[in-house]
């Protein structure tokens, strides 16, 4: 079944905004859950439906997931590196809502640190990485069709669409542009080749 209706969680983050814009431009009917709708762009591609609420509130998540064909998860903590459970608790609510509404495809972004030796994670990023690990475990054990996207450093280079995707390991470059990352998140909706895999998108930008 072709995916037409999608929910995006984390649509107002750096990667979320470009993923949202690309999704609308590609013809998807997009629903977003946002705490503050003023963080959505006032111009350019707009989501079809905006739910104002919190990923930590199960009812808000349920309302966002109802009627969708697939879910994209780009939850983050912005620049807050303190200990958190927002991403993993949010993922629990998303999984519960997906199961309740018969939605079985989820593409979620964590980070390449999950592919590394855990002892090599920079100490200041350890707390956020710990919650990424918890979120990944929730999704991996959910029984859903889950694509784990584990990008390296997210840059601001223009969209190329020419990135490399490495399965279950690290690739040739240590960077992916946020635009290419968004492009890849959407590409995962059109194929089952990445289901059940950890994916590392990267590109050698000029």
From Swiss-Prot:
GO:BP terms for this protein?
Answer: heme catabolic process; megakaryocyte differentiation; negative regulation of insulin receptor signaling pathway
**Taking the first listed entry, what is the main subcellular location of this protein, grouped into a coarse class?**
cytoplasm
Subcellular localization(s) per the UniProt record: Cytoplasm
Which InterPro entries does the entry mention?
NAD(P)-bd_dom, NAD(P)-bd_dom_sf, Polyketide_Oxido-like
Query: Quaternary arrangement and interactors, per the entry?
Result: Monomer.
Briefly state the protein's biological role. Answer: Enzyme that can both act as a NAD(P)H-dependent reductase and a S-nitroso-CoA-dependent nitrosyltransferase. Promotes fetal heme degradation during development. Also expressed in adult tissues, where it acts as a regulator of hematopoiesis, intermediary metabolism (glutaminolysis, glycolysis, TCA cycle and pentose phosphate pathway) and insulin signaling. Has a broad specificity oxidoreductase activity by catalyzing the NAD(P)H-dependent reduction of a variety of flavins, such as riboflavin, FAD or FMN, biliverdins, methemoglobin and PQQ (pyrroloquinoline quinone).
What name is this protein filed under?
Answer: Flavin reductase (NADPH)
Organism name: Homo sapiens
């Amino acid at each position: 079944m072709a995916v037409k209706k999608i929910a995006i969680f984390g649509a107002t983050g750096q990667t979320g905004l470009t993923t949202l814009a690309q999704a609308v431009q590609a013809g998807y009917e997009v629903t977003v859950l946002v705490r503050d709708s003023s963080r959505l762009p006032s111009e350019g591609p707009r989501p079809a439906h905006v739910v104002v609420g919190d990923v930590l509130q199960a009812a808000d998540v349920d309302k966002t997931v109802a009627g969708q064909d697939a879910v994209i998860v780009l939850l983050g903590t912005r620049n807050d590196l303190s200990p958190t459970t927002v991403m993993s608790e949010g993922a629990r609510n998303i999984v519960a809502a997906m199961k309740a509404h018969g939605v079985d495809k989820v593409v979620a972004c964590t980070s390449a640190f999950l592919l590394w030796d855990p002892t090599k994670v920079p100490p200041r990023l350890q707390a956020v990485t710990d919650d990424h690990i918890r979120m990944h475990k929730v999704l991996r054990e959910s029984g859903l069709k889950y694509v784990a996207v584990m990008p390296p450093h997210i840059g601001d280079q223009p969209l190329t669409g020419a990135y490399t995707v490495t399965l279950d390991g690290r690739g040739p470059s240590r960077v992916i542009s946020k635009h290419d990352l968004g492009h890849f998140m959407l590409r995962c909706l059109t194929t089952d080749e990445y289901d059940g895999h950890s994916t590392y998108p990267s590109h050698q930008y000029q």
